[in-house]
């Protein structure tokens, strides 16, 4: 009898927890798409910078959303400081005004204060990350570290493998 009471109390307790877990606040959510200015319907990545801007990488450009409108960054042959890529795969930042943008073919630096882009690395890139005051770039078999963005990267690690891509 005591086991049955315990089992009933336990089941009620667990079901109460489940009900509490399903309680949510009303969230006001507005969806944005190409009709509101997003450059492409396929979104590959998001990043929120230290100023509150939401950076959205799409297949057709880099988008900055300020909460109201989009600003789209695309290659412009007339501007040597424009972004060099359209298909944005990843965005990260250093929380000091610099963004790092990865495509399949390169990594590009964007200085928000100067409103200028410049290529940091060309060639296949598997991933990027900014951590411990350095930009980390992973290729198919190696990991590079940029401590000073004006100097060549340091080869941090290389996988001893005969395979094409490890990462």
PLM regions and their residue ranges:
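Carboxylate-rich, polar loop motifs that coordinate divalent cations or form catalytic acidic clusters
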Residues: 1-167
